[in-house]
């Protein structure tokens, strides 16, 4: 209740953040509609090969996030942040409007790369602006909570909105909704007075990554990114196998399982500001790593079940635990980025986090999918548990060499 009151006050009093948050929500809803529409478009063009098309599109997305983001950040270093954000939104909107007219798989790949390259420009730039807009540490923590809630709610709400719209329109029209989300986002940014951007004098694409590799504080965060990637890959890639193959459930049962993961994440995000009044972000995030490892370990046991009420309860509980653990890491991670950067280095640091965190998925997605397909879900969960455990222990060791962050009391 207290967290909700703080959030309401911040949204009411901080006009700039309110507009930027609205822009984020609009863009996220557009992205959610795009996910549904893209799946239907892939099936319309490729039929039974739609899964391969979407898998390739996901790989293209990760490549854009990992490799394009640092390059674009360096190229746009001297430009006003508003111009960068609005241009990225315009490119995304125009690309979304083009997708309904494609009739070849390769055209999907090209447009997805353009769209995801624009997203790889928008997201870290947006995240790097927020610390300047919300300078107070406590308020910034609440802003991160709101941002995390927006991501989790989008994953739950967007499919429902898409399903409702598809009862009255064709899936091609969903791309118009996607474009509209990006247009609203651009309009909100245009109408917002952003702090003046202080550009770094010499900015190279690898500057942020070099900084990550030099500092124990950021190296620890990099290790925790791997914990998140391991837990998230288990849920994202293999939920459908647990639900449909192991338990014999339906598509609605899959939504049920993913809903528990999202609910766990949202509950954890809501409590982060309160917890950080009594402990520091290192302890909170390392605890989150332990929770995530416990969740992946529990998944090995769940994979041996074959359905029935107890199996569904075990799955719901495990997925909730995974959501809680990943959110305990994700939600406060930007606090470390803010602490380890200044006005001139913030863009490169946030971009490096964006790039490196997604690079971890290039490892965990194949592990979850290929190991699960070849050796079974028990082995896949066990391998991901081992990977997450090693990453969590590495983070703890790295952070033991740094000074504990100061606890910010209420």
Regions found by a protein language model. Give the residues of each.
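A single, central transmembrane helix in multi-pass transporters
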Residues: 25, 29-37, 168-176, 210-271, ...
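Transmembrane alpha-helix termini and helix-breaking/packing motifs in multi-pass membrane transporters
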Residues: 39-46, 98-101, 157-177, 245-246, ...
């Amino acid at each position: 209740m207290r967290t909700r009151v703080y959030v309401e006050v911040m949204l009411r009093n901080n006009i700039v953040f309110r507009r930027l948050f609205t822009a984020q929500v609009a863009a996220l809803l557009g992205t959610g509609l795009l996910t549904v529409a893209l799946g239907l478009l892939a099936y319309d063009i490729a039929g039974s090969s739609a899964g391969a098309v979407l898998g390739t599109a996901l790989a293209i997305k990760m490549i854009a996030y990992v490799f394009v983001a640092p390059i674009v950040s360096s190229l746009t270093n001297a430009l006003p942040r508003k111009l960068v954000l609005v241009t990225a939104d315009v490119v995304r909107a125009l690309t979304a409007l083009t997708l309904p007219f494609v009739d070849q798989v390769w055209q999907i790949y090209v447009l997805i790369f353009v769209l995801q390259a624009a997203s790889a420009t928008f997201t870290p730039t947006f995240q790097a602006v927020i610390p300047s807009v919300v300078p107070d540490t406590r308020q910034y923590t609440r802003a991160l909570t709101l941002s995390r809630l927006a991501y989790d709610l989008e994953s739950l709400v967007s499919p429902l909105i898409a399903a409702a719209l598809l009862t009255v329109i064709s899936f091609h029209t969903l791309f118009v909704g996607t474009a509209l989300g990006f247009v609203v986002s651009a309009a909100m940014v245009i109408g917002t007075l952003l702090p003046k951007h202080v550009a770094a004098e010499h900015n190279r694409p690898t500057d942020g990554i070099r900084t990550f590799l030099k500092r124990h504080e950021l190296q620890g965060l990099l290790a925790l990114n791997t914990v998140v990637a391991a837990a998230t890959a288990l849920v994202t890639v293999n939920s459908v196998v647990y639900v449909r193959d192991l338990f014999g459930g339906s598509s609605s049962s899959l939504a049920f399982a993913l809903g528990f993961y999202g609910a766990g994440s949202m509950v954890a995000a809501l409590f982060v500001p309160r917890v950080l009044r009594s402990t520091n972000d290192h302890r909170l995030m390392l605890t989150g790593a332990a929770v995530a490892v416990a969740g992946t370990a529990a998944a090995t046991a769940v994979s041996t079940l074959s359905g029935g009420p107890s199996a569904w309860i075990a799955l719901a509980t495990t997925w909730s635990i995974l959501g809680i653990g990943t959110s305990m890491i994700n939600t406060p991670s930007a606090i470390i980025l803010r602490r380890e950067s200044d006005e001139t280095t913030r863009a490169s640091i946030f971009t490096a986090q964006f790039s490196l965190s997604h690079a971890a998925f290039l490892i965990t997605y194949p592990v979850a999918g290929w190991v699960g397909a070849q050796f079974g879900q028990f082995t896949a969960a066990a391998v991901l548990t081992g990977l997450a455990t090693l990453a969590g222990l590495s983070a703890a060791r790295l952070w033991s060499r740094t000074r504990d962050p100061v606890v910010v009391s209420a």
